């Protein structure tokens, strides 16, 4: 913590941000949020933190608002005195999350309110005076309201409750997840352990992780504000219609069209399917473990996007980032992930590519089984690849790519920590993991990485200049 002159409280350390990122991970798991919804939530939360710290002249941050799509109108910083960035950020975060999580569990909102109050109290202890606290709280409240007003126009509510009728054509994707894949075994009054009928997935209560730990508490939230992930229904078919945070539109970094569906020998699609099947027919245990490590199913590790947010949370103390720098890293990473899901979903439900399990069982091997259950949305491009490409582009841009690290994001759910030589090495592994898992053809992961790097580059352009 760095103490500055002029009698002001010291600049807060990065824990002020990682406290919020850890709370977000807990929330996404406990509320059972699907990947797109979780990404939207985290991006608005990240923006609230960034804009809160940017209001403090000491932070060196400028507001991102003028450069965001559909530029939100943010309140002017008070001119009659200084504000404390940590207090502004905590209050803005509370306002934003209390609204976005209003249909969640009561315990979720209590955690948000308690953390905000604790951070304000810490800043008082650090020496922020009553007048500055009052100005900061008022500005944080106004800032949170402005972000919510912008969020209300992103198209999310227009997609709630809209019926989607699957095409039910052989050449179009159809959800293969069924209720009998998930067989509950009650562990306690708070949760169920869910095993799957897939023989390739070994299930132990000590190592449940992505293999199927689903919270099973009563949840009143309907589809309007906080829908829970349901693997037996197509996930968010209209998500590609949402307004991106930074991209001018969802197609700004669109991948090339995938090959047309064809079961004929010699066709491009048949060749793609054959190459996939040949690569996974005999899968060594080491590659199976890669597939499981990056599965990131909802509830287990908090979705694919939150895997990278967990990495961000690890990097903040390791790099000794203060709160403003941590808020910038968190905000840009979460917005890159959010835009990645919007762009990915636009193409997924446009191309409607049949998943490998369906194609292989039809054409090559009726007995084929995947390593993990196939996700409930179309195949192309790979969402893991797009959002990983986007997140890593931001991480490399802000932290460099020479940092070795150990990814411990899934230790608490039974997966061993995994070392990586660089962010780019992890990015390549997560992309290939989707082939090993049996849920993507190779073009989906390669084109997905390209799309993700394009998205991440556009988001990274918002970062403050580096010396």
What kind of region is each of these model predictions?
Residues 9-467:
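Acidic/polar surface patches and capping/hinge elements
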């Amino acid at each position: 913590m760095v103490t500055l002159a002029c009698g002001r409280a010291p600049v807060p350390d990065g824990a002020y941000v990682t406290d919020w990122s850890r709370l977000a991970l807990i929330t996404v798991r406990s509320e059972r949020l699907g990947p797109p919804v979780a990404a939207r939530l985290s991006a608005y939360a990240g923006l609230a933190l960034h804009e809160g710290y940017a209001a403090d002249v000491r932070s060196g941050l400028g507001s991102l608002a003028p450069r965001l799509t559909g530029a939100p109108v943010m309140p002017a910083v008070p001119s009659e005195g200084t504000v404390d960035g940590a207090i502004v950020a905590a209050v803005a975060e509370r306002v934003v999350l209390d609204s976005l999580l209003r249909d969640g569990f009561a315990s979720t909102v209590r955690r948000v309110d308690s953390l905000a109050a604790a951070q304000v109290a810490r800043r008082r202890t650090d020496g922020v005076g009553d007048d500055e606290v009052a100005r900061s709280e008022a500005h944080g409240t106004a800032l949170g309201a402005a972000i919510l007003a912008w969020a209300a126009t992103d198209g999310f509510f227009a997609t709630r409750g809209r019926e989607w009728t699957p095409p039910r054509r052989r050449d179009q994707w159809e959800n293969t997840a069924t209720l009998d894949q998930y067989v509950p075994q009650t562990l306690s009054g708070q949760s169920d352990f869910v095993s799957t009928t897939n023989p390739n997935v070994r299930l132990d209560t000590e190592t449940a992780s992505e293999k199927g730990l689903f919270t099973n508490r009563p949840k009143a939230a309907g589809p309007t504000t906080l829908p829970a992930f349901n693997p037996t229904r197509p996930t968010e078919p209209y998500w590609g219609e949402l307004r991106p945070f930074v991209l001018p539109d969802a197609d700004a970094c669109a991948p090339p069209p995938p090959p047309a569906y064809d079961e004929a020998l010699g066709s491009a699609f048949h060749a793609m399917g054959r190459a996939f099947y040949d690569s996974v027919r005999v899968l060594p245990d080491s590659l199976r473990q890669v597939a499981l490590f990056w599965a990131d199913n909802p509830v287990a590790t908090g979705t694919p996007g939150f895997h990278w947010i967990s990495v961000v949370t690890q990097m903040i103390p390791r790099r000794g980032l203060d709160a403003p720098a941590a808020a910038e890293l968190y905000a840009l990473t979460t917005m890159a992930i959010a835009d990645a899901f919007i762009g990915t979903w636009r193409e997924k439900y446009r191309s409607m590519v049949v998943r490998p399990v369906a194609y292989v069982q039809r054409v090559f091997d009726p007995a084929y089984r995947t390593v993990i259950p196939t996700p409930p949305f179309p195949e192309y491009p790979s969402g893991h690849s797009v959002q990983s490409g986007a997140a890593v582009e931001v991480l490399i841009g802000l932290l460099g790519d020479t940092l070795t690290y150990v990814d411990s994001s899934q230790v608490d759910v039974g997966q061993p920590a995994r070392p990586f030589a660089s962010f780019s090495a992890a990015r390549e592994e997560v992309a290939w993991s989707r082939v090993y898992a049996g849920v993507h053809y190779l073009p989906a992961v390669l084109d997905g990485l390209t799309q993700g790097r394009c998205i991440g580059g556009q988001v990274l352009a918002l970062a403050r200049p580096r010396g």
